[in-house]
Swiss-Prot record:
This is Bombesin receptor subtype-3. Keywords: Cell membrane, Disulfide bond, G-protein coupled receptor, Glycoprotein, Lipoprotein, Membrane, Palmitate, Receptor, Transducer, Transmembrane, Transmembrane helix. The chain crosses the membrane at residues 42-63, 83-103, 122-143, 164-184, 221-241, 273-293, 314-333. It holds the Pfam family 7tm_1.
Amino acid sequence: MSQKQPQSPNQTLISITNDTESSSSVVSNDTTNKGWTGDNSPGIEALCAIYITYAVIISVGILGNAILIKVFFKTKSMQTVPNIFITSLALGDLLLLLTCVPVDATHYLAEGWLFGRIGCKVLSFIRLTSVGVSVFTLTILSADRYKAVVKPLERQPSNAILKTCAKAGCIWIMSMIFALPEAIFSNVHTLRDPNKNMTSEWCAFYPVSEKLLQEIHALLSFLVFYIIPLSIISVYYSLIARTLYKSTLNIPTEEQSHARKQVESRKRIAKTVLVLVALFALCWLPNHLLNLYHSFTHKAYEDSSAIHFIVTIFSRVLAFSNSCVNPFALYWLSKTFQKQFKAQLFCCKGELPEPPLAATPLNSLAVMGRVSGTENTHISEIGVASFIGRPMKKEENRV
Protein backbone atom coordinates (compact mmCIF):
# COMPACT_ATOMS: atom_id res chain seq x y z
CA MET A 1 0.00 0.00 0.00
CA SER A 2 1.43 3.38 -1.01
CA GLN A 3 1.96 5.88 1.72
CA LYS A 4 0.46 9.13 0.49
CA GLN A 5 2.28 12.35 1.30
CA PRO A 6 0.81 15.83 1.61
CA GLN A 7 0.52 17.46 -1.77
CA SER A 8 2.27 20.68 -2.68
CA PRO A 9 -0.35 23.30 -3.61
CA ASN A 10 0.93 23.86 -7.11
CA GLN A 11 2.60 20.59 -8.08
CA THR A 12 1.44 17.08 -8.90
CA LEU A 13 3.84 14.22 -9.57
CA ILE A 14 2.71 11.47 -11.96
CA SER A 15 4.59 8.46 -13.25
CA ILE A 16 4.88 8.39 -17.02
CA THR A 17 5.03 4.62 -16.97
CA ASN A 18 1.57 4.04 -15.51
CA ASP A 19 0.12 7.56 -15.84
CA THR A 20 -1.38 7.42 -12.36
CA GLU A 21 -1.26 10.42 -10.10
CA SER A 22 0.79 10.47 -6.93
CA SER A 23 0.58 13.17 -4.31
CA SER A 24 4.31 13.22 -3.61
CA SER A 25 5.98 16.56 -4.09
CA VAL A 26 9.47 15.06 -4.21
CA VAL A 27 11.29 13.97 -7.31
CA SER A 28 14.62 12.54 -6.28
CA ASN A 29 17.17 12.86 -3.59
CA ASP A 30 19.57 13.59 -6.38
CA THR A 31 17.72 15.70 -8.87
CA THR A 32 15.50 18.65 -8.18
CA ASN A 33 13.37 20.72 -5.88
CA LYS A 34 10.87 23.47 -6.44
CA GLY A 35 13.48 26.15 -5.94
CA TRP A 36 15.32 25.17 -9.09
CA THR A 37 12.68 26.15 -11.63
CA GLY A 38 10.02 28.72 -12.28
CA ASP A 39 10.04 31.96 -10.32
CA ASN A 40 12.69 30.64 -7.94
CA SER A 41 15.23 29.69 -10.60
CA PRO A 42 18.72 31.15 -10.18
CA GLY A 43 19.72 34.27 -12.08
CA ILE A 44 22.08 34.37 -15.02
CA GLU A 45 25.06 35.14 -12.78
CA ALA A 46 24.39 32.10 -10.61
CA LEU A 47 23.89 29.89 -13.65
CA CYS A 48 27.19 31.07 -15.14
CA ALA A 49 28.97 30.32 -11.88
CA ILE A 50 27.39 26.85 -11.75
CA TYR A 51 28.33 25.99 -15.34
CA ILE A 52 31.88 27.28 -14.92
CA THR A 53 32.25 25.15 -11.79
CA TYR A 54 30.96 22.06 -13.56
CA ALA A 55 33.20 22.73 -16.56
CA VAL A 56 36.26 23.03 -14.31
CA ILE A 57 35.40 19.79 -12.47
CA ILE A 58 34.88 17.89 -15.72
CA SER A 59 37.93 19.20 -17.60
CA VAL A 60 40.37 19.11 -14.69
CA GLY A 61 39.10 15.73 -13.51
CA ILE A 62 39.32 14.11 -16.93
CA LEU A 63 42.82 15.52 -17.47
CA GLY A 64 44.13 14.49 -14.06
CA ASN A 65 42.69 10.97 -14.04
CA ALA A 66 43.65 10.32 -17.67
CA ILE A 67 47.25 11.30 -16.94
CA LEU A 68 47.30 9.14 -13.79
CA ILE A 69 46.06 6.15 -15.80
CA LYS A 70 48.54 6.86 -18.59
CA VAL A 71 51.42 7.08 -16.10
CA PHE A 72 50.45 3.70 -14.67
CA PHE A 73 50.29 1.92 -18.04
CA LYS A 74 53.38 3.58 -19.56
CA THR A 75 55.70 3.43 -16.54
CA LYS A 76 56.58 -0.11 -15.47
CA SER A 77 57.91 1.05 -12.12
CA MET A 78 54.39 2.24 -11.31
CA GLN A 79 52.76 -1.11 -12.05
CA THR A 80 52.59 -2.39 -8.48
CA VAL A 81 49.93 -3.83 -6.21
CA PRO A 82 48.64 -0.63 -4.54
CA ASN A 83 48.93 1.36 -7.75
CA ILE A 84 46.55 -1.08 -9.45
CA PHE A 85 43.91 -0.09 -6.91
CA ILE A 86 44.69 3.61 -7.36
CA THR A 87 44.35 3.25 -11.13
CA SER A 88 41.04 1.41 -10.68
CA LEU A 89 39.93 4.32 -8.52
CA ALA A 90 40.87 6.73 -11.31
CA LEU A 91 38.90 4.68 -13.86
CA GLY A 92 35.79 4.89 -11.68
CA ASP A 93 36.22 8.64 -11.30
CA LEU A 94 36.73 9.05 -15.04
CA LEU A 95 33.53 7.12 -15.75
CA LEU A 96 31.56 9.42 -13.46
CA LEU A 97 33.10 12.56 -14.98
CA LEU A 98 32.31 11.48 -18.54
CA THR A 99 28.68 10.53 -17.88
CA CYS A 100 26.93 11.64 -14.71
CA VAL A 101 28.53 15.04 -14.15
CA PRO A 102 27.67 16.46 -17.61
CA VAL A 103 24.13 15.07 -17.31
CA ASP A 104 23.73 16.65 -13.89
CA ALA A 105 24.76 20.02 -15.32
CA THR A 106 21.82 19.93 -17.74
CA HIS A 107 19.38 20.15 -14.80
CA TYR A 108 20.06 23.89 -14.59
CA LEU A 109 19.61 24.50 -18.30
CA ALA A 110 16.63 22.34 -19.22
CA GLU A 111 13.19 22.21 -17.62
CA GLY A 112 13.40 18.53 -16.79
CA TRP A 113 15.00 15.21 -17.65
CA LEU A 114 16.29 14.91 -21.23
CA PHE A 115 17.54 11.34 -21.40
CA GLY A 116 14.45 9.16 -21.15
CA ARG A 117 13.62 6.18 -18.99
CA ILE A 118 16.59 4.08 -20.15
CA GLY A 119 18.97 6.97 -19.59
CA CYS A 120 17.59 7.40 -16.09
CA LYS A 121 18.29 3.77 -15.22
CA VAL A 122 21.70 3.60 -16.89
CA LEU A 123 23.00 6.82 -15.36
CA SER A 124 21.70 5.86 -11.93
CA PHE A 125 23.57 2.56 -12.29
CA ILE A 126 26.80 4.27 -13.39
CA ARG A 127 26.67 6.85 -10.61
CA LEU A 128 26.30 4.32 -7.81
CA THR A 129 28.83 1.93 -9.38
CA SER A 130 31.43 4.70 -9.45
CA VAL A 131 30.77 5.62 -5.82
CA GLY A 132 31.06 1.96 -4.84
CA VAL A 133 34.34 1.52 -6.70
CA SER A 134 35.76 4.55 -4.90
CA VAL A 135 34.83 3.67 -1.34
CA PHE A 136 35.43 -0.10 -1.61
CA THR A 137 38.81 0.44 -3.27
CA LEU A 138 39.86 2.80 -0.49
CA THR A 139 38.82 0.15 2.03
CA ILE A 140 40.98 -2.49 0.34
CA LEU A 141 43.87 -0.02 0.08
CA SER A 142 43.67 0.60 3.82
CA ALA A 143 43.84 -3.14 4.46
CA ASP A 144 46.82 -3.33 2.11
CA ARG A 145 48.61 -0.54 4.01
CA TYR A 146 47.95 -2.30 7.30
CA LYS A 147 49.54 -5.48 5.99
CA ALA A 148 52.53 -3.52 4.65
CA VAL A 149 53.10 -1.87 8.02
CA VAL A 150 52.71 -5.04 10.10
CA LYS A 151 54.73 -7.30 7.76
CA PRO A 152 56.86 -4.94 5.67
CA LEU A 153 59.39 -7.51 4.44
CA GLU A 154 57.06 -10.42 3.77
CA ARG A 155 57.74 -11.96 0.38
CA GLN A 156 54.58 -12.07 -1.68
CA PRO A 157 53.75 -14.66 -4.35
CA SER A 158 54.89 -14.19 -7.93
CA ASN A 159 51.29 -13.80 -9.08
CA ALA A 160 50.57 -10.91 -6.69
CA ILE A 161 49.91 -8.50 -9.57
CA LEU A 162 47.45 -10.90 -11.19
CA LYS A 163 45.65 -11.46 -7.89
CA THR A 164 45.41 -7.72 -7.33
CA CYS A 165 43.87 -7.23 -10.77
CA ALA A 166 41.33 -9.92 -9.89
CA LYS A 167 40.55 -8.13 -6.60
CA ALA A 168 40.06 -4.84 -8.44
CA GLY A 169 37.72 -6.61 -10.86
CA CYS A 170 35.75 -8.07 -7.95
CA ILE A 171 35.36 -4.57 -6.50
CA TRP A 172 33.80 -3.44 -9.78
CA ILE A 173 31.48 -6.45 -9.88
CA MET A 174 30.42 -5.94 -6.26
CA SER A 175 29.78 -2.24 -6.91
CA MET A 176 27.62 -3.12 -9.91
CA ILE A 177 25.62 -5.61 -7.85
CA PHE A 178 24.95 -2.96 -5.20
CA ALA A 179 23.94 -0.50 -7.94
CA LEU A 180 21.44 -2.88 -9.60
CA PRO A 181 18.48 -2.18 -7.26
CA GLU A 182 18.78 1.55 -7.93
CA ALA A 183 18.85 0.93 -11.68
CA ILE A 184 15.77 -1.29 -11.40
CA PHE A 185 13.70 1.14 -9.32
CA SER A 186 14.84 4.32 -11.10
CA ASN A 187 12.15 5.84 -13.28
CA VAL A 188 11.15 9.05 -15.01
CA HIS A 189 8.31 11.02 -13.45
CA THR A 190 6.43 14.07 -14.63
CA LEU A 191 6.20 17.19 -12.51
CA ARG A 192 3.04 19.17 -13.33
CA ASP A 193 2.52 22.79 -12.30
CA PRO A 194 -1.20 23.66 -12.73
CA ASN A 195 -0.65 27.37 -12.01
CA LYS A 196 1.67 27.76 -14.99
CA ASN A 197 0.20 24.98 -17.13
CA MET A 198 3.67 23.42 -17.35
CA THR A 199 5.01 19.89 -17.04
CA SER A 200 8.58 18.63 -16.75
CA GLU A 201 10.12 15.18 -16.39
CA TRP A 202 12.63 14.11 -13.74
CA CYS A 203 14.59 11.00 -12.92
CA ALA A 204 13.92 9.52 -9.47
CA PHE A 205 16.00 6.74 -7.95
CA TYR A 206 13.10 5.00 -6.16
CA PRO A 207 9.27 4.85 -6.35
CA VAL A 208 8.44 8.41 -5.30
CA SER A 209 5.00 7.52 -3.96
CA GLU A 210 6.52 5.18 -1.35
CA LYS A 211 7.76 7.32 1.53
CA LEU A 212 9.18 4.29 3.33
CA LEU A 213 11.25 3.27 0.29
CA GLN A 214 12.69 6.77 0.09
CA GLU A 215 13.84 6.53 3.69
CA ILE A 216 15.24 3.01 3.26
CA HIS A 217 17.08 4.05 0.09
CA ALA A 218 18.75 7.04 1.74
CA LEU A 219 19.64 5.12 4.90
CA LEU A 220 21.09 2.09 3.09
CA SER A 221 23.11 4.31 0.76
CA PHE A 222 24.55 6.15 3.74
CA LEU A 223 25.44 2.91 5.53
CA VAL A 224 26.75 0.83 2.61
CA PHE A 225 28.60 3.56 0.73
CA TYR A 226 29.82 5.69 3.63
CA ILE A 227 29.48 4.63 7.28
CA ILE A 228 30.44 0.93 7.07
CA PRO A 229 33.47 1.32 4.74
CA LEU A 230 34.80 4.33 6.65
CA SER A 231 34.35 2.47 9.93
CA ILE A 232 36.44 -0.41 8.58
CA ILE A 233 39.06 2.04 7.35
CA SER A 234 39.13 3.69 10.77
CA VAL A 235 39.83 0.31 12.41
CA TYR A 236 42.71 -0.38 10.02
CA TYR A 237 44.26 3.03 10.60
CA SER A 238 43.93 2.67 14.35
CA LEU A 239 45.87 -0.58 14.07
CA ILE A 240 48.42 1.09 11.79
CA ALA A 241 48.92 3.91 14.30
CA ARG A 242 49.35 1.43 17.15
CA THR A 243 51.87 -0.63 15.17
CA LEU A 244 53.90 2.43 14.23
CA TYR A 245 53.89 3.64 17.83
CA LYS A 246 55.12 0.28 19.13
CA SER A 247 57.80 0.04 16.45
CA THR A 248 59.09 3.46 17.52
CA LEU A 249 59.36 2.35 21.16
CA ASN A 250 61.16 -0.88 20.26
CA ILE A 251 63.89 0.66 18.12
CA PRO A 252 67.37 -0.48 19.33
CA THR A 253 69.75 2.35 20.21
CA GLU A 254 72.47 1.26 17.79
CA GLU A 255 69.98 1.26 14.92
CA GLN A 256 68.09 4.36 15.99
CA SER A 257 68.75 6.51 12.95
CA HIS A 258 68.20 3.81 10.32
CA ALA A 259 65.08 2.39 11.97
CA ARG A 260 63.51 5.79 12.43
CA LYS A 261 63.88 6.39 8.71
CA GLN A 262 61.96 3.18 8.13
CA VAL A 263 59.20 4.27 10.50
CA GLU A 264 59.00 7.66 8.82
CA SER A 265 58.71 5.93 5.46
CA ARG A 266 55.80 3.85 6.75
CA LYS A 267 54.09 6.97 8.01
CA ARG A 268 54.44 8.74 4.66
CA ILE A 269 52.91 5.85 2.74
CA ALA A 270 50.03 5.39 5.18
CA LYS A 271 49.46 9.14 5.01
CA THR A 272 48.97 8.99 1.24
CA VAL A 273 46.08 6.56 1.44
CA LEU A 274 44.67 8.37 4.48
CA VAL A 275 44.57 11.64 2.52
CA LEU A 276 42.56 9.94 -0.25
CA VAL A 277 40.17 8.51 2.34
CA ALA A 278 39.77 11.89 4.06
CA LEU A 279 39.01 13.58 0.74
CA PHE A 280 36.32 11.01 -0.03
CA ALA A 281 34.76 11.37 3.43
CA LEU A 282 34.78 15.17 3.25
CA CYS A 283 33.40 15.41 -0.28
CA TRP A 284 30.55 12.92 0.09
CA LEU A 285 29.32 13.66 3.63
CA PRO A 286 27.19 16.75 2.74
CA ASN A 287 25.51 14.88 -0.12
CA HIS A 288 24.59 11.92 2.10
CA LEU A 289 23.30 14.19 4.86
CA LEU A 290 21.19 16.16 2.38
CA ASN A 291 19.74 12.94 0.96
CA LEU A 292 18.77 11.83 4.46
CA TYR A 293 17.22 15.23 5.15
CA HIS A 294 15.21 15.10 1.92
CA SER A 295 14.05 11.54 2.53
CA PHE A 296 13.05 11.84 6.18
CA THR A 297 11.77 15.43 6.09
CA HIS A 298 8.88 15.75 3.67
CA LYS A 299 8.80 19.54 3.57
CA ALA A 300 12.45 19.69 2.49
CA TYR A 301 11.39 19.40 -1.16
CA GLU A 302 9.00 22.33 -0.77
CA ASP A 303 11.81 24.55 0.50
CA SER A 304 12.38 27.13 -2.25
CA SER A 305 14.71 29.34 -0.22
CA ALA A 306 18.04 30.53 -1.56
CA ILE A 307 19.84 28.86 1.35
CA HIS A 308 18.37 25.45 0.50
CA PHE A 309 19.29 25.92 -3.15
CA ILE A 310 22.87 26.91 -2.28
CA VAL A 311 23.29 23.98 0.12
CA THR A 312 21.98 21.60 -2.55
CA ILE A 313 24.34 22.93 -5.21
CA PHE A 314 27.26 22.90 -2.78
CA SER A 315 26.70 19.26 -1.77
CA ARG A 316 26.47 18.08 -5.37
CA VAL A 317 29.49 20.03 -6.56
CA LEU A 318 31.55 18.85 -3.59
CA ALA A 319 30.59 15.21 -4.23
CA PHE A 320 31.52 15.44 -7.91
CA SER A 321 34.77 17.24 -7.11
CA ASN A 322 35.99 14.11 -5.33
CA SER A 323 36.38 12.55 -8.77
CA CYS A 324 39.01 15.11 -9.76
CA VAL A 325 41.06 15.69 -6.58
CA ASN A 326 42.89 12.36 -6.19
CA PRO A 327 45.47 12.89 -8.97
CA PHE A 328 46.34 16.29 -7.52
CA ALA A 329 46.59 14.88 -4.01
CA LEU A 330 49.12 12.39 -5.36
CA TYR A 331 50.89 15.22 -7.19
CA TRP A 332 51.18 17.11 -3.92
CA LEU A 333 52.43 14.08 -1.96
CA SER A 334 54.74 12.55 -4.56
CA LYS A 335 57.81 14.01 -6.20
CA THR A 336 58.02 11.01 -8.51
CA PHE A 337 54.43 11.41 -9.65
CA GLN A 338 55.02 15.15 -10.09
CA LYS A 339 57.78 14.39 -12.59
CA GLN A 340 55.76 11.75 -14.41
CA PHE A 341 52.68 14.00 -14.42
CA LYS A 342 54.63 16.89 -15.95
CA ALA A 343 56.24 14.59 -18.51
CA GLN A 344 52.86 13.28 -19.68
CA LEU A 345 51.19 16.69 -19.50
CA PHE A 346 53.77 18.26 -21.78
CA CYS A 347 53.90 15.19 -24.04
CA CYS A 348 57.50 14.31 -23.31
CA LYS A 349 58.64 11.29 -25.30
CA GLY A 350 59.38 8.14 -23.39
CA GLU A 351 59.61 7.58 -19.66
CA LEU A 352 61.68 9.71 -17.39
CA PRO A 353 65.12 8.21 -16.67
CA GLU A 354 65.25 6.18 -13.48
CA PRO A 355 67.40 7.70 -10.72
CA PRO A 356 70.61 5.84 -9.77
CA LEU A 357 69.89 3.04 -7.35
CA ALA A 358 72.82 3.77 -5.09
CA ALA A 359 71.72 7.33 -4.50
CA THR A 360 68.22 6.54 -3.35
CA PRO A 361 67.08 6.30 0.26
CA LEU A 362 65.72 3.17 1.88
CA ASN A 363 62.04 2.48 2.01
CA SER A 364 61.40 -0.44 4.33
CA LEU A 365 57.81 -1.07 3.29
CA ALA A 366 57.93 -3.78 0.66
CA VAL A 367 55.40 -5.29 -1.67
CA MET A 368 55.89 -7.29 -4.80
CA GLY A 369 56.77 -5.54 -8.02
CA ARG A 370 58.53 -6.28 -11.27
CA VAL A 371 61.92 -4.85 -12.16
CA SER A 372 61.98 -3.41 -15.65
CA GLY A 373 63.58 -5.74 -18.14
CA THR A 374 63.22 -8.89 -16.05
CA GLU A 375 60.59 -11.52 -15.47
CA ASN A 376 61.49 -12.14 -11.84
CA THR A 377 59.41 -10.81 -9.00
CA HIS A 378 61.25 -9.62 -5.90
CA ILE A 379 60.80 -7.77 -2.69
CA SER A 380 60.45 -4.16 -3.75
CA GLU A 381 59.26 -0.80 -2.62
CA ILE A 382 55.61 -0.34 -1.80
CA GLY A 383 53.46 0.60 -4.77
CA VAL A 384 52.15 3.86 -3.39
CA ALA A 385 55.75 4.81 -2.70
CA SER A 386 56.19 4.92 -6.46
CA PHE A 387 53.81 7.86 -6.37
CA ILE A 388 55.50 9.20 -3.24
CA GLY A 389 58.93 8.94 -4.77
CA ARG A 390 60.74 6.90 -2.12
CA PRO A 391 62.85 4.39 -4.08
CA MET A 392 65.06 1.83 -2.40
CA LYS A 393 68.71 1.24 -1.68
CA LYS A 394 71.14 -0.35 -4.05
CA GLU A 395 70.80 -3.82 -2.54
CA GLU A 396 67.03 -3.86 -2.97
CA ASN A 397 64.92 -3.89 -6.10
CA ARG A 398 63.11 -0.67 -6.78
CA VAL A 399 59.62 -0.54 -8.27
